[in-house]
């Protein structure tokens, strides 16, 4: 896979030289290139922004430096020349980046990240880029950062770690949070007793079937407590009886293949009507 990142702060991307991402670059699994947007300016001040039309606060990133930078990146496209690279524009106005999207993007030949700053990039750049790229504005969440670089670090790691050969034990990718729409189960290591807290006995039993079932039920419990919104989207159509029972104990019923949370009955923590 080839990844290109365009930013006015290329040094911000230095962490991509470390850990598994850095090793993937060394091993030839990942070809990652960081480009300084200011290298594509033509004035002596190397300016990349100007005041917004229509007034308002802040500055807007100018179109021409971006067009020059993206044209250069597009000319160096990887893989099938007929297949457009994917241009990801980190933005709080983009679609939510998820583990499912990370898996989808891990199958692409080339990704390009455009790190905006200030009030954003001139919208005409996005319109122009659609002729040369598959444009995907994306957001890490419902909050605002100073620029796209932090989001690029997170997205790149989430995507690259899914490439074959990057993570040493591929099974760890299968069992982690969000891989199946649920949060990961709790994990423990030695010693088995620590400050009067014990490791759950089932994990010491050696019974792999019971351990797998316990872990699955813990996934349901943790997801219900921390991210109940994920259970609302969870495909429950083919769950075994033990899973349905565990979810029932948490207040969830399977209805038409989806999970529905039962309202608490009066006397169980919910006030009675009237």
Curated annotation (Swiss-Prot):
Enzyme Commission no: 2.1.1.228
Catalytic activity: guanosine(37) in tRNA + S-adenosyl-L-methionine = N(1)-methylguanosine(37) in tRNA + S-adenosyl-L-homocysteine + H(+)
Enzyme class name: transferase
Source organism per UniProt: Arthrobacter sp. (strain FB24)
One annotated GO molecular function: tRNA (guanine(37)-N1)-methyltransferase activity
Family membership noted in the UniProt record: Belongs to the RNA methyltransferase TrmD family.
Biological process, per Gene Ontology: tRNA N1-guanine methylation
Broad class of the protein's primary localization: cytoplasm
Subcellular location: Cytoplasm
Keyword field: Cytoplasm, Methyltransferase, S-adenosyl-L-methionine, Transferase, tRNA processing
Any single GO CC term annotated in Swiss-Prot or TrEMBL for this entry: cytosol
Record-linked InterPro entries: Alpha/beta_knot_MTases (IPR029028), tRNA_m1G_MeTrfase_C_sf (IPR023148), tRNA_m1G_MeTrfase_TrmD (IPR002649), tRNA_m1G_MTases_N (IPR029026), tRNA_MeTrfase_TRMD/TRM10 (IPR016009)
Native organism taxonomy: Bacteria, Bacillati, Actinomycetota, Actinomycetes, Micrococcales
Binding-site positions, S-adenosyl-L-methionine: 116, 140-145
The protein's assembly and partners: Homodimer.
Free-text function comment from the UniProt entry: Specifically methylates guanosine-37 in various tRNAs.
NCBIfam families: PRK00026.1 (NF000648), trmD (TIGR00088)
Protein name: tRNA (guanine-N(1)-)-methyltransferase
């Amino acid at each position: 896979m080839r990844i290109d990142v365009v930013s006015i702060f290329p040094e911000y991307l230095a962490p991509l030289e470390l850990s598994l991402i850095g090793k993937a670059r060394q091993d030839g699994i990942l070809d990652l290139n960081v480009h300084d947007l200011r290298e594509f300016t033509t004035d002596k001040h190397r300016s990349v922004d100007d005041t917004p039309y229509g007034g308002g606060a802040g500055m807007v990133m100018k179109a021409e430096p971006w067009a020059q930078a993206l044209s250069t990146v597009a000319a160096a496209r990887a893989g099938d020349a007929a297949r457009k690279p994917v241009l990801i524009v980190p933005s709080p106005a983009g679609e939510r980046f998820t583990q499912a999207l990370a898996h989808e993007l891990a199958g692409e030949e080339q990704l390009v990240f455009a790190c905006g700053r200030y009030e954003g990039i001139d919208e005409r750049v996005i319109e122009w880029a659609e002729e040369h790229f598959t444009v995907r504005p994306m957001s890490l969440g419902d909050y605002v950062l100073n620029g796209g670089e932090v989001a690029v670090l997170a997205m790149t790691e989430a995507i690259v770690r899914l490439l074959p050969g990057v993570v040493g034990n591929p099974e760890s990718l299968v069992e982690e949070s969000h891989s199946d729409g649920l949060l990961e189960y709790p994990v423990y290591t030695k010693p088995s007793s620590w400050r009067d807290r014990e490791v759950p006995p089932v994990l010491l039993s050696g019974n792999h079937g019971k351990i797998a079932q316990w872990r699955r039920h813990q996934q349901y419990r943790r997801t219900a407590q921390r991210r109940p919104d994920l259970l609302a989207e969870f495909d429950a159509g083919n769950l075994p009886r033990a899973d349905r029972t565990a979810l029932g104990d948490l207040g969830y019923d399977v209805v038409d293949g989806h999970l529905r949370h039962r309202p608490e009955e009066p006397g169980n923590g919910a006030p009675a009507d009237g």
